[in-house]
Swiss-Prot record:
Pfam families: TRC8_N (PF13705), zf-RING_2 (PF13639). Residues 620-631 have a biased composition (Basic and acidic residues). GO terms for cellular component: endomembrane system; membrane. Its main location: membrane. It is a multi-pass membrane protein. InterPro entries: HRD1_E3_ubiq-ligases, RNF145_RING-H2, TRC8_N_dom, Znf_RING, Znf_RING-CH, Znf_RING/FYVE/PHD. Residues 582-685 are annotated as: Disordered. This is RING finger protein 145. Residues 583-602 have a biased composition (Low complexity).
Length: 685
């Protein structure tokens, strides 16, 4: 079943290539120049060529026929090709019969065949050929009525029966007329088939559009026709024919420089029409996809195909080629100018492929450096690919400077190559830092700061390169030749590579600066608070020997919280906005008014603030406290969840000017010690 599906896929593509070939030929065929040549030749008196408009209509009929062949379903397309093959076989049988009759007329021998060796050889050859033609026709048409295709055997039978040669000529004509009538009958019997197919196709298209819409219809046709593979195969066939035509007309093999020129000119010849240009676009897309797939396989092996990234499909390179070709009018240029411009466009495509390779390799290399993988082969593959991406773009920029005169387009290519090399250099430096930290026994302090400075350095260099490109483009526009395309490229380059990069870098700097200020403004937890908290950092899941306390009373490592604040301004646990909660404090360990104390639940503080404050150094305070305590004991109220768990204490409350008795209160203290003065409360533990 898999083999059958593959064969059907190959047939689906291969049988549609002639339709695009026909479109290519019709586009290249200049009808007006064709009729001018006919008028200057002897064919001008031919009545067929007197009706020029009929030929023009046939030209448009060819377009319709090619579109029908392109969109016809595979089953009907196979049947159509079988019918065409049968017609060609019948024509071959007619040619064999005509050649045999001419040979017999030239010899003039009318006697028995076995007496003349030459006549016997001609007869045997013609008989074998006609039998093969009849057999193939019956097999192709899947019928056992082989006599339908054996009309051209009549001249052979007549010659075997010693019929005169003049009569054999008429018999051959009768065989030709009989075969032609068969073909006409077959065409007439299937005359309504195209109409029925068009009617069915229209009804299905209307149903699909009503249910799913035009977009779904376009996607369905795209998948059924396999247009990218179809245009790629068409362009490869066209390119192979161009190379074959060149080498078939040359006796000596070309030199190395000539081969490069031949390669560029052949590509330029094969993109002179919109159809061949689309074929080149899809071919470049598939080549880019193959290169990126090999890059993934080289880095990760078969694991790369498990988590395939939809972003690296090679479509970016193909779309880049198409946009540049359309904007520069590539198909309207001469072959030499087209080859020169195409070389520059291909350099841009190669630079885009290198950038995509870097996007694939960068996270893999950094993850490999941060992990503890000891496989030398993995590290060798990652580092070797990075070294290639470091050296090759620089070499390509050097070659461009050597062979081309500098202009804005070439400066964009060179800047892209330099940026790729800079990014690879930054990736390698970070990888080296990770490996140094791995081999050291103690971790490197402020490693994130070092990595940030490395990234910031090459980002700054990228920004400077982009600014230089924009400055050169503006100067060339002001003092050189002004074009709409050049100005558009400058604006797009200025927005994406200058303004957005500057804005992103400035935002990153502000986030880091605000994070440092926030960490400095937060109180530091004391040793007692850390012991009472007795928890790990929720970011790194490690024990805390030192920590800072957020306004929402959560404990974190200062370094971990700073890294978190580099990205967002919320608490990692409660996701509250730290920016709005931060307020200036009087001292690092003292909570301000409205701010909960360290290691204290905000809900408890809020409930305490709602309750009236009670003075305990008066008789009313003691009575209120006793009433509150007795009420809590009767109702069985527990402490609020999240309050501090302290050891039970036995307190003697002594009030001045009263004869109150001592009450032994055993249990958890509801209030902190700060709420009761030491002169009024004596606690005996």
């Amino acid at each position: 079943m898999a083999m059958k599906a593959r064969l059907e896929s190959v047939l689906n593509v291969g049988l549609r290539i002639p339709s695009i070939m026909l479109l290519e030929v019709l586009y290249r065929w200049d009808v007006s120049s064709f009729f001018q040549k006919i008028q200057r030749s002897s064919l001008n008196n031919n009545p067929v060529f007197q009706y020029k408009y009929i030929a023009l209509y046939l030209h448009y009929v060819g377009y319709i026929l090619s579109l029908v062949l392109l969109t016809l379903p595979r089953q009907h397309l196979v049947q159509l090709y079988l019918y065409v093959l049968t017609a060609l076989l019948l024509f071959a049988g007619h040619q064999l019969s005509r050649d045999y009759v001419r040979g017999e007329l030239d010899s003039g021998y009318e006697g028995p065949l076995y007496l003349e060796p030459l006549s016997m050889n001609r007869f045997t050859t013609a008989l074998i050929g006609q039998v093969v033609v009849c057999t193939l026709c019956s097999c192709v048409m899947q019928t056992r009525q082989i006599w339908l295709f054996s009309a051209h055997l009549l001249p052979l039978v007549a010659r075997l029966c010693l019929v005169p040669l003049e009569t054999i000529v008429f018999i051959n004509r009768f065989a030709m007329i009989f075969t032609g009538l068969e073909v006409l009958y077959f065409i007439a019997s299937n005359l309504l088939v195209p109409y029925n197919l068009a009617k069915t196709a229209y009804r299905e298209l209307v149903q699909v559009v009503e249910v799913y819409g035009l977009l779904a219809l376009g996607m369905s046709l795209w998948n059924q026709l396999v247009l990218p593979v179809l245009f790629m195969c068409f362009w490869l066939v066209l390119f192979a024919l161009q190379i074959y035509t060149y080498f078939s007309t040359r006796d000596q093999p070309p030199s190395r420089e000539r081969l490069l020129f031949l390669f560029l000119t052949s590509i330029a010849e094969c993109c002179s029409t919109p159809y061949s240009l689309l074929g080149l676009v899809f071919t470049v897309s598939f080549v880019a996809l193959g290169v990126l797939t090999l890059c993934k396989f080289y880095l990760q092996g078969y694991r790369a195909f498990m988590n395939d990234n939809a972003m690296h499909r090679g479509m970016t390179e193909g779309i880049t080629l198409l946009i540049l070709a359309v904007q520069t009018g590539l198909i309207e240029l001469q072959v030499i100018h087209r080859a020169f411009l195409l070389s520059i466009i291909l350099f841009i495509v190669v630079a885009s492929i290198l950038q995509s390779m870097l996007e694939i390799a960068d996270p893999i290399v950094l993850a490999l450096g941060a992990s503890r993988d000891k496989s030398l082969w993995k590290h060798f593959r990652a580092v070797s690919l990075c070294l290639f991406l470091l050296v090759f773009p620089a070499y390509m920029a050097y070659m461009i400077c050597q062979f081309f005169r500098m202009d804005f387009w070439l400066l964009i290519i060179i800047s892209s190559s330099i940026l790729t090399s800079l990014q690879v250099l930054g990736t390698l430096l970070i990888y080296v830092l990770f490996m140094v930290e791995e081999f050291r026994k103690a971790p490197v302090e402020n490693m994130d700061e070092v990595i940030y400075y490395v990234n910031g350095t090459y980002r700054l260099l990228e920004f400077l390169v982009a600014v230089c490109v924009v400055a050169y483009g503006v100067s060339e526009t002001l003092f050189g030749e002004w074009t709409v395309m050049g100005s558009t490229i400058i604006l797009v380059h200025s927005y994406y590579n200058v303004w957005l990069r500057a804005q992103l870098g400035w935002q990153s700097f502000l986030l880091r600066r605000d994070a440092v200020h926030k960490i400095q403004s937060m109180p530091t937890a004391s040793t007692l608070q850390l012991q009472q908290h007795n928890d790990i950092c929720s970011i790194c899941f490690q024990d805390m020997k030192s920590a800072v306390i957020t306004p929402c009373s959560h404990f974190f490592h200062a370094a971990c919280l700073k890294k978190w604040l580099y990205v967002q301004e919320t608490c990692p646990l409660c996701h509250g906005q730290l920016k709005s909660q931060l307020q200036p404090t009087s001292s690092p360990g003292t909570p301000t008014q409205g701010t909960p104390a360290a290691n204290q639940n905000p809900r408890e503080v809020e409930q305490e603030q709602r309750q009236p404050q009670v003075e305990l150094n008066t008789e009313e305070g003691i009575r209120a406290e006793e009433m509150k305590t007795s009420a809590e004991q009767k109702l069985g109220m527990d402490l609020l969840p999240g309050s501090l768990n302290t050891q039970p204490k036995e307190c003697d409350l002594v009030a001045e000017g009263s004869a109150g008795t001592a009450s032994n209160l055993k249990g958890d203290d509801y209030y902190d010690d700060d709420d009761v003065s030491t002169s009024d409360v004596n606690c005996a533990s």
